[in-house]
C-alpha cells in the first residue's frame, strides 16, 4: 500500500505506482485546520469589498480566487478512482466533532474505497486531560463511522496513556483498522512572545 505522499497528488504518478504493483493508495490528508481557515477566509472576502459602494468594479471579490480546497480534494479522489483500478483511500486529519461526518460522507461519495482518520492532536491547553483527549478521539471515531459505509482506518499517535486500551476503545467505537503510528510533530515555543507555535 502506498502511504500518503506527493505521489498521490497527480493521477499520472499514482498510475505509475499502480503499474509498479502497489495494491492501494492512501491520499494525502484533508486537514481540519485547512477547512476552518479557508471557510473563514472565504467569509472574510465575501463580506468585505475593497471599495465601499456597490457600483465599484471590485466591490465583490472574484469568486474564482477563493475556491475552497476541500472541493478540489473531493474532485481529486473522484479523478483517482477513474484513473486507477486499485483502491483509493481518502484521509481526514482532525480531532473535533462536527463537520467531519459531512466530509467523511463526501469523500465516500467521491468514490473512496476506505477512509483513514488521522487523529493527530498537539495538546497545548493545560485544562484538557489525557482522558479528555482520548474520549474526544473515541467519540470522533464513533461519529465518523456512523456516517459512512466504507471501512474506517484510524491513524493514532504513540503518545497515549495505554496503547492497548485506547486501540480497543477505538475498535469498539467502529474502527475497522488501525495505522500505527502518526509522524511526530512537536510544537515549538516563541521565547520572545511566550507563545506556542504549531
Show the residue positions of the predicted features.
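Alpha/beta enzyme core
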Residues: 2-59, 68-198
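The substrate-binding groove and active-site-proximal loops of carbohydrate-active enzymes
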Residues: 63
Amino acid at each position: 500500500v502506498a502511504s500518503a505522499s506527493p505521489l498521490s497528488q497527480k493521477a499520472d504518478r499514482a498510475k505509475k505506482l499502480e503499474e509498479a504493483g502497489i495494491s492501494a493508495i492512501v491520499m494525502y490528508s484533508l486537514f481540519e485546520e485547512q477547512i476552518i481557515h479557508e471557510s473563514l477566509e472565504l467569509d472574510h472576502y465575501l463580506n468585505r469589498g475593497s471599495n465601499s459602494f456597490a457600483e465599484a468594479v471590485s466591490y465583490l471579490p472574484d469568486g474564482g480566487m477563493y475556491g475552497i480546497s476541500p472541493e478540489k480534494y473531493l474532485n481529486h479522489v473522484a479523478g483517482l478512482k477513474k484513473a486507477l483500478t486499485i483502491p483509493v483511500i481518502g484521509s481526514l486529519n482532525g480531532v473535533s466533532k462536527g463537520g467531519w461526518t459531512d466530509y467523511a460522507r463526501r469523500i465516500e461519495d467521491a468514490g473512496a474505497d476506505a477512509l483513514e482518520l488521522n487523529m493527530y492532536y498537539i495538546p497545548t491547553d493545560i485544562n484538557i486531560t489525557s482522558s479528555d483527549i482520548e474520549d474526544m478521539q473515541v467519540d470522533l471515531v464513533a461519529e465518523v463511522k456512523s456516517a459512512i459505509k466504507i471501512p474506517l482506518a484510524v491513524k493514532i499517535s504513540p503518545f497515549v496513556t495505554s496503547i492497548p486500551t485506547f486501540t480497543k476503545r477505538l475498535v469498539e467505537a467502529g474502527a475497522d483498522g488501525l495505522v500505527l503510528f502518526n509522524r511526530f510533530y512537536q510544537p515549538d515555543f516563541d521565547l520572545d512572545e511566550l507563545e506556542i507555535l504549531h
